[in-house]
Amino acid sequence: MTIWVDADACPNVIKEILYRAAERMQMPLVLVANQSLRVPPSRFIRTLHVAAGFDVADNEIVRQCEAGDLVITADIPLAAEAIEKGAAALNPRGERYTPATIRERLTMRDFMDTLRASGIQTGGPDSLSQRDRQAFAAELEKWWLEVQRSRG
């Protein structure tokens, strides 16, 4: 079981939560990025550097993740592919994607893309709040408890 992070777009404060969690859980944490990352020294934390390019990091995460893994991403198509493989998916704001919710999120994403392509300014997401950080940490902990229960 591994936690995979779409690290190029992951906020640093979320990475810090993940570093601490990987140590506490003794769970492999892999940060996939097309740029160099500095991570704390740990036998549980590693980086995977990929070439720059559209969806290169996403494709590598999809290729390597397995059922039971956790993928941290705000990229909805990546989350959908991870879920199809049996992995869990969580965004940096603490929203856990499920097979039931991912279809709705994909539809909304496509709709927003259409609006932007037609010249309508849709704005971006709000900055990450303390509440978002707490929601992320709580959902990460919830996933970890599910993993422990499934192991017996």
Curated annotation (Swiss-Prot):
Domain of life: Bacteria
Family classification: Belongs to the UPF0178 family.
Classification via NCBIfam families: PRK00124.1
Listed name of the protein: UPF0178 protein YaiI
Organism: Shigella boydii serotype 18 (strain CDC 3083-94 / BS512)
